[in-house]
Amino acid sequence: MTQNISFIVHLPGKPEAREELYSSLIKVLDEMSNEPDFVNTYLHRSADDPDTLVLYETWACSAQYFMEHHLKKPYRVNYEGKLKGLLKSERTFEWLDLVKGYERKDK
């Protein structure tokens, strides 16, 4: 059984690049959701800063494999190339260690 990884990505966008950041990211998310290692992702907008997008992602691979392979996929090249110009500060990854999981119980 493959161990899943989960992480949070913070994308603090420039106010003038809000729509471009969002539309560029959606294209990447649409493509990455077809990857065999992909489990899920949830895109959020920060309640404190509407220019900041936050992703919660889960993948069925190691963190090292994700960084070495998934960030270099052809469909990400354009996005990764222009990302720095869309952000007011650097993108950050927050890696998570699962402590315990809960799922809704059907009644």
Predicted feature locations:
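Glycine-rich beta-strand-turn "strand-cap" elements at beta-sheet edges
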Residues: 2-5, 42-51, 80-107
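Short, well-ordered beta-strand segments in beta-rich or mixed alpha/beta enzyme
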Residues: 5-12, 40-71
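Small-side-chain structural scaffolding
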Residues: 6-9, 13, 28, 100-101
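Short, surface-exposed ligand-recognition loops at beta-strand->loop->(often short) alpha-helix junctions
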Residues: 12-22
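Alpha-helical structural elements of signaling/regulatory helical domains
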Residues: 16-17, 47, 75
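Residue-level signal for secondary-structure boundary sites
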Residues: 17-19, 63-65, 101
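An amphipathic, aromatic/His-enriched active-site/gating alpha helix that lines ligand/cofactor pockets
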Residues: 27, 33-39, 58-94
